[in-house]
Swiss-Prot record:
GO annotation, cellular component aspect: membrane
Name the UniProt record assigns to this protein: Protein trichome birefringence-like 10
TM regions (residue ranges): 33-53
Extra information: Contains 2 motifs that are conserved in esterases, but it is unlikely that this protein belongs to the catalytically active pectin esterases.
Gene Ontology BP terms: circadian rhythm
Organism encoding this protein: Arabidopsis thaliana
Membrane topology: Single-pass type II membrane protein
Motif (DCXHWCLPGXXDXWN motif): 424-438
Function as written in the Swiss-Prot or TrEMBL entry: May act as a bridging protein that binds pectin and other cell wall polysaccharides. Probably involved in maintaining esterification of pectins. May be involved in the specific O-acetylation of cell wall polymers.
Motif (GDS motif): 176-178
Gene encoding the protein: TBL10
Length: 469
């Protein structure tokens, strides 16, 4: 009897043991997958909580740098169209406020802003085909949605109508190389957005904007103002060398003379100058272009010395030829190029760049040396109280981070894209980086206008007539 009962007990136990063995085998099969899945879920929870609970505090607690505004590529922070960005912004003063006077607007970061760009290329008829990247093949538009955020203050939003009112009956003149033209066309687009009837904006000589060399003058008839561009890559004239010069001297730069078109800029109310891209051996001595002072060609003078002497000539002209009571002068610094694996002649590229290099500089040592020369020249002449003050648009460091902003393959218009070995990594797509230069220009211009407006109000108060502008 006991034997049968043992058999029965064993027989009943077998299915249970077999089930346990099968469960163990299946558990061994699924254990790695469950482990990976669990690890993944824990990781997701940690990442989400990191951003949910304010990653600035987490970063600080671990001794990490608080660079929240540099994590913009994640789009978790500093989106001005969202209320989440208001905390840091509200702590900063407005640049145009009296308390914002000490703010360095060129010290800051690029932040993602979905309210940008300020215009669309298809809506602006004042753009060269070479700058209309999105119209002619460039499919990514990330480069249009970055805003410059100064570290210690907030820039004013560009107000095209207000700017045009300030320019009423005035001349705004850009002088420089094709990068200066890039900025000039950007400003035309920004300003034209406030004019409903675009037939009231026209080139006074009927010249087309695309592939036109020399100078162009666009009039905003409703405001009786002009926004002009004069091509002068060196700001000093390039001409035939003196008779008897060595055969290798094909042309010369007259370092002690202003460009011949300078008589056309002299009466400008606002003057924006730039030079830099042509001050290198490739554009000068290697092509037979040497430097001249008086009637003597300086065969041994290097490019940096020549650049410095030319800048001194420009500054002297500003101080002696311009009316300090009328003309505001701005000087924009060099905007770095971003060729990889060569330059524009040797197969350099930038077509794979779609994001900025946040927080780091991609500028060469030559670029920083050029900036130092410019700053030294302007600083040396800044203490002369009787002269025109030159305001520096110091965009070099901020532009150095924007390797993503160039036309690359998309500068040939409807005939593009260009061959891979012939890319443009010098100029800038529009809308794009030059719009930011103009936002900074606008901020400095409006800051300069504010004291004169206050002075007019005070004068009106003293006579009993108050007018607001």
């Amino acid at each position: 009897m006991s034997k049968n009962s043992n058999v029965e007990e064993n027989g009943g136990a077998k299915p249970i043991c077999e089930a346990l063995r099968r469960f163990k085998r299946s558990r061994l099969v699924f254990e790695p997958s469950l482990g990976v899945l669990g690890f993944f879920l824990v990781g997701v929870c940690l990442v989400c909580s990191f951003f949910f609970f304010d990653y600035r505090s987490v970063a600080k607690s671990y001794g990490l740098s608080d660079k929240s505004e540099r994590f913009v590529w994640l789009k978790f922070d500093n989106i001005s169209s969202s209320s989440s960005s208001s905390s840091n912004s509200s702590k900063r003063v407005g640049f145009l406020e009296e308390s914002g006077s000490g703010c360095d607007v060129f010290d800051g970061d690029w932040v993602w802003d979905e309210s940008y760009p300020l215009y669309q290329s298809k809506d602006c008829r004042f753009l060269d085909e070479g700058f209309r990247c999105s119209d002619f093949g460039r499919s990514d538009l990330f480069y249009t949605q970055w805003r410059w955020q100064p570290r210690h203050c907030n820039l004013p939003r560009f107000d095209a109508k207000l700017m045009l009112e300030k320019l009423r009956d005035k001349r705004l003149v850009f002088v420089g190389d094709s990068i200066g033209r890039n900025q000039w066309e950007s400003l035309l687009c920004l300003l034209s957005s406030a004019v409903k009837n675009e037939s009231l904006i026209y080139e006074i000589n009927g010249s087309p904007i695309t592939k036109h060399k020399g100078f162009l003058v666009f009039k905003f008839e409703e405001y009786n103002c002009t926004v002009e561009y004069y091509r002068s890559p060196f700001l000093v004239p390039q001409s035939r060398p003196p008779i008897g010069s060595p055969g290798k001297v094909k042309t010369s730069l007259k370092l002690d003379t202003m460009d011949w078109t300078s008589s056309k800029w002299r009466d400008a109310d606002v003057l924006v100058l730039n030079t830099g891209h042509w001050w290198n051996e490739g554009k000068t001595t290697r092509t037979g272009c040497y430097f001249q002072e008086g009637e003597e060609v300086k065969l041994k003078m290097n490019v940096d010395d020549a650049y410095k002497r030319a800048l001194n000539t420009v500054v002297k002209w500003i101080h002696t030829e311009l009316d300090s009571n009328k003309t505001q002068v701005f000087f924009r610094t060099f905007a770095p190029v971003h060729f990889r694996g060569g330059d524009w002649k040797t197969g350099g590229t930038c077509h794979m760049e779609t994001l900025p290099e946040i927080g780091t500089s991609l500028a060469s040592s030559e670029t920083w040396e050029q900036l130092k020369i410019l700053r030294d020249v302007l600083s040396h002449n800044s203490n002369r109280s009787e002269t025109v003050k030159v305001k520096l648009l110091n965009i070099t460091a901020m532009a150095a981070q924007r390797k993503d902003g160039h036309p690359s393959l998309y500068y040939l218009g409807p005939h593009g894209p260009a061959p891979l070995h012939r890319q443009d990594c010098s100029h800038w797509c529009l809308p794009g980086v030059p719009d930011t230069w103009n936002e900074l220009f606008y901020a400095l211009f409006m800051k300069q206008e504010a004291p004169s407006s206050s002075k007019r109000v005070e004068e009106a108060n003293s006579t009993g007539n108050v007018t607001m502008s």
